[in-house]
Amino acid sequence: MTFHQPVSETAQPDEASGHPLFADAPSSVEFNKLRKRLLRQVRQAFEDFTMVKPGDRWLVALSGGKDSYGLLAVLLDLKWRGLLPVELLACNLDQGQPNFPKHILPDYLTRLGVPHRIEYQDTYSVVTEKIPENRTYCSLCSRLRRGHLYRIAREEGCSSLVLGHHREDILETFFMNFFHGGRLAAMPPKLLNDEGDVLVLRPLAYCAETDLVKFAEGMKFPIIPCDLCGSQDGLQRNAMKAMLEDIERRMPGRKDTMIRALANVRPSHLLDRQLFDFAGLGIL
């Protein structure tokens, strides 16, 4: 993908160096290209959306899924190379899901020497009490989790909460709002919370989910499945994912085009009277 003011290829450090978590990473040309691409795309997001303020402290949400592992790895890699002048604190919120393997994340983070906080909050019981058994838990679960992460960010003196949403998450959200919400809205790479005291950052905004899958496989992250609670993600999001995959299969490169479109809005060619003064438009 090409964006305005692209990060220079010459600014990329040698892929042989990096954080110790890459000590056992594949040495293949293909994996090194993948790793360099993720680094470049994250740095591009930093630039495009002014995410980095030197000296800040970031709370990096770590669920145990491929996306959050990939996010943490890229951030640690950039920090190790001197390209991310912020302090990182990894955080996992144990929400009391059945059979959640409590040892995996603390063991992984301790072994790598990554500063972290493990927080236990039984939101699972709250969700199962309020949501009928045949409905998906994901929406309420996510809202409760976000509230606790904001609180933890405040307690830890973190200015930003960093999440692992990627390119496909943004596009799926856009089309869910488009088809089901009747509005043009996606998932912003940078957002100020309602209280105005914590920024939400999504550095993987330009990263493809397929790349994150390959990266996780190469790094052999100890993945924790996201369906421990027995609930499945909403049917609407699954339908949007299937639609996007079908479009990309038939017309390769369309996802990149869609992401570029979200950064190229023409209010005068839409119907929102709050964004464009149609009443004041006329022949002089």
Curated annotation (Swiss-Prot):
One of its GO terms (biological process) is tRNA thio-modification. CDD domains: TtcA-like. Residues 1-20 are annotated as: Disordered. One of its GO terms (molecular function) is 4 iron, 4 sulfur cluster binding. Keywords: 4Fe-4S, ATP-binding, Cytoplasm, Iron, Iron-sulfur, Magnesium, Metal-binding, Nucleotide-binding, RNA-binding, Transferase, tRNA processing, tRNA-binding. InterPro entries: Rossmann-like_a/b/a_fold, TilS/TtcA_N, tRNA_Cyd_32_2_STrfase, tRNA_thiolation_TtcA_Ctu1. Pfam families: ATP_bind_3. Pathway: tRNA modification. GO terms for cellular component: cytoplasm. Gene3D superfamilies: HUPs. The thiolation reaction likely consists of two steps: a first activation step by ATP to form an adenylated intermediate of the target base of tRNA, and a second nucleophilic substitution step of the sulfur (S) atom supplied by the hydrosulfide attached to the Fe-S cluster. Catalyzes the ATP-dependent 2-thiolation of cytidine in position 32 of tRNA, to form 2-thiocytidine (s(2)C32). The sulfur atoms are provided by the cysteine/cysteine desulfurase (IscS) system. Belongs to the TtcA family. This is tRNA-cytidine(32) 2-sulfurtransferase. It comes from Chelativorans sp. (strain BNC1). The gene is ttcA.
